[in-house]
């Protein structure tokens, strides 16, 4: 069972019968059924033996279910960390990033969220549990299954490429798949000439081995897989494998496509089985809220965790009641915030959801409580329709409450995209919400044109909106409006934008770098 840690869940039930179900599944050796169940009991010694089997290689097809105890805190945090990586991959794929670009973005995040190339049992345990937890989250519909399989398969490819050649061989051998059996050294020697002639071009163009002696040296160490040619029909058509007696000979460096197809096929089958066993978790009122939260696509943006303790502080000395209207600051606002600011400027008022969304955003970028009251009072009273007395009576408390200065003194955080999308859609006279979801294509297209996006770029953004990928649409706009400047972000930083404040933070960071470069250029020119 899960241990309670730092959390107390009300209305706990007796789960002894549930444990019996799990044990019976495991006792009869029904690993397909057991794969779907994470809650189970085992001694620490049994757990060590099991993980010794699970972790024979640094990479896994996740064939066996995890056992043993983890806390609810681990359950949630491990799943969220893995989900961050998968959503980043999904976002990169939707934005047509190249494989090399995705690897550059993802690899550093492994070290922070999901350490992989390590001997640590705890890290491997986290990898294993988080994968199975997310199976429970994303087995519930065909669309969710397809997204999960696509992202996990790409993650598998990146990890495989990070292994050494020795570890790759060890992993393939551990799979014990009929299709993935290496030929003997004797058979390789017998077919050496034909095999080298077939793969020489691939060694040059795929592995950049331009010298003949380099290719021959690599070939001497390379292992080959023999399998029915119909399993690699695409490679056969491109003449990338040697054929003999109905069998194709596949070099180890080309086996990844075969492995990833096998991984994706197995995972999809297991997700369907997981869905069939999902009703067994309906009695567990501790897990369902977490699973429902995760399966909605929820993720905690890096901004939330990194800046959680700074929301009530002035993190940018230049942020005050006047500067938030300035071109320098407002040019970094995402479209949703620009819309709110325009609505406030036009009407000298915002309705409740609009006030909350904008107030907490401004708090997040560093607007202090005193400056916030100054900002809102000036905005509401500027046209003379509202007196200062009415503002203090009807609105002052609410804005102070957002800063934790009234009521229960809760330090509210800025809304992320998930929260914004969960609120009621805006009606006539409302300015809150997400423009990528709530605006018509005509209005959104006109706005994007005013931001100097090309027609092809606008179509790309609208396509993401049509698919319901609103945060991806926003991320595309960020990249298109910042051009290649986004490459100046720190390596390993989250590129997928799922928070208005993250958009602002990234844009402001790039803006300050550009300002610094311009100052240095002026200084250098002045000294010549």
UniProtKB/Swiss-Prot annotation:
Protein's GO biological process: DNA replication; DNA replication initiation; DNA replication, synthesis of primer; double-strand break repair
GO terms of molecular function: 4 iron, 4 sulfur cluster binding; DNA binding; metal ion binding
Pfam families: DNA_primase_lrg
InterPro entries associated with the record: DNA_primase_lsu_euk (IPR016558), DNA_primase_lsu_euk/arc (IPR007238)
Domain of life: Eukaryota
Entry binding sites for [4Fe-4S] cluster: 336, 417, 434, 474
Region (H-T-H-like motif): 210-239
Keyword Iron: yes
Cofactor note: Binds 1 [4Fe-4S] cluster.
Keyword Cell inner membrane set for record: no
GO cellular component: alpha DNA polymerase:primase complex; nuclear envelope; nucleus
Effect of residue 152 to Q: Temperature-sensitive
Cofactors required: [4Fe-4S] cluster
UniProt keyword annotations, A-Z: 4Fe-4S, DNA replication, DNA-binding, Iron, Iron-sulfur, Metal-binding, Primosome
Function: DNA primase is the polymerase that synthesizes small RNA primers for the Okazaki fragments made during discontinuous DNA replication. In a complex with DNA polymerase alpha (DNA polymerase alpha:primase) constitutes a replicative polymerase. Both primase components participate in formation of the active center, but the ATP-binding site is exclusively located on p48.
Subunit organization: DNA polymerase alpha:primase is a four subunit enzyme complex, which is assembled throughout the cell cycle, and consists of the two DNA polymerase subunits A POL1 and B POL12, and the DNA primase large PRI2 and small PRI1 subunits. Interacts with MCM10.
Recorded family membership: Belongs to the eukaryotic-type primase large subunit family.
Protein's name according to its UniProt entry: DNA primase large subunit
Taxon lineage: Eukaryota, Fungi, Dikarya, Ascomycota, Saccharomycotina
């Amino acid at each position: 069972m899960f241990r309670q840690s730092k959390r107390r869940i009300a209305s706990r039930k007796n789960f002894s019968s549930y444990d019996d179900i799990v044990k019976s599944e495991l006792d009869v050796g029904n690993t397909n059924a057991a794969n779907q169940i994470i809650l189970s009991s085992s001694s620490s010694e049994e757990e060590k033996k099991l993980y010794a089997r699970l972790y024979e290689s640094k990479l896994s097809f996740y064939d066996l279910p995890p056992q043993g105890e983890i806390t609810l805190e681990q359950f949630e945090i491990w799943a969220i960390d893995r989900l961050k990586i998968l959503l980043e991959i999904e976002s990169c794929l939707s934005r047509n990033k190249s494989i090399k670009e995705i690897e550059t973005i993802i690899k550093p995040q492994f070290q922070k969220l999901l350490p992989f190339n390590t001997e640590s049992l705890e890290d491997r345990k986290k990898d294993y549990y988080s994968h199975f937890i997310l199976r429970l989250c994303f087995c519930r519909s065909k669309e969710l299954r397809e997204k999960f399989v696509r992202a996990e398969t790409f993650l598998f490819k990146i990890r495989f490429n990070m292994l050494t050649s020795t570890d790759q061989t060890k992993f393939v051998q551990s799979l014990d798949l009929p299709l993935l059996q290496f030929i003997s050294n004797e058979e390789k020697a017998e077919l050496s000439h034909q095999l080298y002639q077939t793969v020489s071009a691939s060694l040059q163009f795929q592995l950049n081995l331009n010298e003949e002696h380099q290719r021959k040296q690599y070939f001497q160490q390379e292992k080959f897989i023999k399998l029915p040619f119909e399993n690699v029909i695409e490679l056969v058509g491109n003449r990338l494998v040697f054929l003999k007696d109905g069998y194709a000979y596949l070099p180890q460096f080309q086996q990844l496509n075969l492995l990833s197809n096998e991984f994706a096929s197995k995972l999809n089958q297991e997700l369907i089985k997981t869905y069939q066993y999902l009703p067994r978790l309906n009695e567990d009122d501790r897990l369902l809220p977490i699973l429902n939260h995760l399966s909605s696509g929820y993720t905690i943006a890096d901004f939330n965790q990194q800046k959680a303790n700074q929301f009530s502080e002035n993190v940018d000395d230049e942020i005050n009641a006047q500067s938030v209207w300035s071109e320098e600051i407002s040019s970094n606002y995402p479209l949703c915030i620009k819309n709110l600011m325009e609505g406030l400027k036009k009407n000298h008022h915002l309705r409740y959801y609009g006030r909350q969304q904008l107030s907490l955003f401004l708090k997040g970028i560093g607007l202090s409580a005193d400056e916030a009251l100054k900002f809102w009072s000036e905005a509401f009273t500027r046209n003379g329709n509202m007196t200062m007395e009415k503002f203090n009576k009807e609105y002052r408390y609410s804005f102070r409450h957002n800063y934790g200065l009234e009521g229960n003194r809760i330090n509210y955080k800025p809304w992320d995209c998930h929260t914004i999308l969960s609120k009621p859609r805006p009606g006539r006279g409302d300015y809150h919400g997400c423009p990528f979801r709530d605006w018509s294509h005509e209005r959104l297209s006109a706005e994007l044109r005013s931001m100097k996006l090309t027609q092809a770029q606008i179509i790309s953004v609208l396509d993401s909106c049509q698919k319901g990928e609103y945060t991806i649409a926003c991320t595309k706009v960020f990249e298109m409006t910042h051009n290649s400047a986004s490459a100046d972000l720190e390596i390993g930083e989250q590129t997928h934008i799922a928070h208005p404040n993250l958009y602002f933070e990234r844009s402001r960071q790039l803006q300050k770098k550009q300002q610094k470069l311009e100052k240095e250029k002026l200084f250098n020119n002045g000294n010549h």
